[in-house]
């Protein structure tokens, strides 16, 4: 049985129960002194960069559409408990349309213009796309006009013509959107900065096990319409964010762990 680490004494947490053990993190549900549940998350040191950016993102959000960061020590984070009900449950129980409307409403809150300055630690979206740009250069040098080349051109144009940069969650999908005592919140941000349209891109490819949805042109159009209204973005720019799919493919082709935006 895996024993939890020694949690910082000033957190005053008790009754740890391991609820997730993945390649990327260990997660315990704990109790705060008043009995309120909370989460302690441990990230491997080699994977700490994304987590630190994500922590800065949560501090910046200060509970607005996202779980609250209650404390952090090295690679340990103490987080607000977000419940157990995910947006994927809404898809299964009430249908994809309702889930999309929930996601759109949450993104409108999450990606609204903020008077708070963006954290300097957030990763520029262009840096996140480095693998796609490299794959496109390799294909062009080989004389091949591939989907990677086309997607890289679109991504570069979107980044170069971005009207306003926003703080982005960086890994928004149906299992990172949770129904808590405060309503729908996001968990596990990566922490990026870029055009708001990129913040919705991953949703078109999710749920990951539902190709019947992800490949349905009517669903894609409905999502683009819902997200464009929520984010006040031209739906064509949202659809151009399909470049994310080629980025994910480039990561997988290079044998890297899949990321998201």
Where are these regions (language model features)?
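A glycine-centered beta->alpha junction motif in the catalytic cores
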Residues: 45, 76-96, 112-116, 130-141, ...
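Conserved NTP-binding catalytic cores of kinases and kinase-like/nucleotidyltransferase enzymes
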Residues: 1-66, 180-183
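Active-site Asp-x-Gly
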Residues: 179-225, 229-232
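A conserved alpha-helical element in kinase catalytic cores
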Residues: 36-80, 85-110
